[in-house]
Amino acid sequence: VIPYFGWARQDRKDKPRVSIGAKLVADLLSVAGIDRLITMDLHADQIQGFFNIPVDHLYASAVFLPYIESLKLDDLVIATPDVGGSKRASTFSKYLGVPLVLCNKTREKANVVATMQIIGDVKDKNVVLVDDIVDTAGTITKAANIMMEAGAKSVRAIASHCVMSDPASFRVQESGLTEMVFTDSI
């Protein structure tokens, strides 16, 4: 059982002569003798294909969706802080029957967001940002701040995996986030 598969962001080659870390770890686990893996909210679905054993891929939406419903927020929209999370956020918006808002970001380098634009309307809305991993919190806090500047009533964030590397705590405290909710996968 590996709730947080920490190598999941290394799911493809992004530079020459770099290994695909998620595939390497999948091979190591198989050689070590595991015959089944249970994990949660993989960063990329294709990681399941790196294994030669059955992978049970669980989703935190089973916990998060009832929580969001319990908030009874009016004018709710679901948002994703990056286009890569659009499939995940779309599942939430369809289930809840509310609009979906996307953020389009560009990065200068790893863990550094250069620019971000909102695609959709957040003015006078209660926004719930849905993500899989919060590491340095740069993306999620930038998205929250941009949405507050665009007139959102409130911005909450939910994420499956809470890494919170420095300077994440500072960024969250200084951001426009009303609330952050995580699982205890780490």
Predicted regions mapped to residue ranges:
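PRPP-associated nucleotide enzymes
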Residues: V1-I186
